[in-house]
C-alpha cells in the first residue's frame, strides 16, 4: 500500500515537472529562500543574544574594576565605600545600596554605609541595632544559597514575617544582597534595594564583597591604632594627642 502511494506521488511530481517546469523551479527557489531566511533569522538572534551577553559581561567587568579602583586609591575609606555603593546602585539601577555589619555579642546588625539615589528615602538612621531575629531569614538564605534575592516582596515573603514588615516600612519591593564573610563567619552583608536591571545577577556583588571586607578591616585597624595613639602606654590615660584632637 505504501509503495503504491509513493509511486503515485512520484508520478504526480514527474508529471508536474513536465507540464509546469517554470512553476516547479519557482517553488523550489521559494523553498530555498524560505529556508535561508529561517536559518539567517535564527543565526542573527543567536548573534544578537551573544552580543548582549558580551556587552553585559564587559559592563560588569568595567564596574568591578571601577569599584576596586575606588576602594584601592581613595585615601578616605568612607569616601571609597560611598563611591563603590554609588557604582553598584547605578549598575543595578536601584534605589539604594548599603552595607550592614553584624554584632554577635549584642545580637544586632547596623547599617554602616548607605547610598541613595535621588528620590529615594535614606534609611540608615532607622536601621541601627536591629535585632538579628529580624534578618534570620536572610542569614539562612545566605548560608544555603550564598545570596538573598527577592523579586517580589508581596509574592515571595510571608506577610506575617519580620522580613516583610521591615521591608514594607522602607517601600522595598525587591532586593538583592550577598554576605560579607570573614573566617567562614557572616559578618555583614552588601545589598541593593529595588534593582530595576540585572536583579538576578549577583556575580558583581559576590566579586566586590571580598574587597569591601578588606577595606572595612583596614578601617577597623586604623581606628584601633588611632585610639591607641590617644592613650599613654604606661598610664593608659589620654595623652597630648587626645588633647590636640
PLM feature spans:
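GAF sensory/regulatory domain recognition
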Residues: 99-140, 146
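Signal-transducing coupling segments at domain and membrane junctions
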Residues: 151-173
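Helix-loop-beta substructure at the N-terminus of cytosolic sensory domains
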Residues: 70-112
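Signal-transmission linkers at sensory-effector interfaces
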Residues: 31-38, 42-73, 225, 235
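Amphipathic alpha-helical "output/dimerization" segments
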Residues: 196-217
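A short, aliphatic-rich beta-strand micro-motif
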Residues: 173-181
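Conserved nucleotide-binding and Mg2+-coordinating catalytic segments in signaling enzymes
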Residues: 69, 223-245
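Short beta-strand-to-loop transition segments that serve as allosteric relay/switch motifs
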Residues: 188-198
Amino acid at each position: 500500500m505504501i509503495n503504491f502511494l509513493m509511486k503515485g506521488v512520484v508520478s504526480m511530481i514527474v508529471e508536474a515537472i513536465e507540464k509546469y517546469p517554470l512553476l516547479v523551479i519557482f517553488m523550489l527557489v521559494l523553498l530555498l529562500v524560505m529556508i535561508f531566511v529561517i536559518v539567517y533569522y535564527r543565526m542573527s538572534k543567536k548573534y544578537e543574544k551573544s552580543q548582549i551577553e558580551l556587552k553585559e559581561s564587559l559592563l560588569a567587568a568595567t564596574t568591578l574594576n571601577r569599584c576596586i579602583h575606588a576602594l584601592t586609591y581613595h585615601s578616605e575609606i568612607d569616601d571609597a565605600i560611598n563611591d563603590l555603593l554609588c557604582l553598584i546602585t547605578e549598575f543595578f539601577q536601584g534605589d539604594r545600596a548599603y552595607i550592614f555589619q553584624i554584632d554577635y555579642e549584642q545580637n544586632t546588625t547596623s547599617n554602616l554605609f548607605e547610598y541613595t539615589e535621588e528620590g529615594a528615602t535614606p534609611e540608615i538612621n532607622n536601621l541601627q541595632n536591629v535585632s538579628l531575629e529580624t534578618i534570620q531569614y536572610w542569614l539562612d538564605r545566605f548560608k544555603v544559597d550564598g545570596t538573598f534575592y527577592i523579586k517580589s516582596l508581596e509574592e515571595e515573603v510571608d506577610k506575617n514575617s519580620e522580613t516583610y514588615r521591615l521591608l514594607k516600612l522602607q517601600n522595598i519591593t525587591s532586593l538583592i544582597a550577598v554576605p560579607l564573610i570573614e573566617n567562614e563567619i557572616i559578618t555583614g552583608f552588601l545589598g541593593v534595594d529595588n534593582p530595576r536591571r540585572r536583579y538576578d545577577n549577583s556575580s558583581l556583588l559576590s566579586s566586590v564583597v571580598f574587597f569591601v571586607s578588606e577595606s572595612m578591616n583596614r578601617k577597623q585597624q586604623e581606628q584601633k591604632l588611632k585610639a591607641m595613639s590617644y592613650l599613654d602606654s604606661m598610664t593608659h590615660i589620654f595623652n597630648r594627642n587626645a588633647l590636640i584632637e
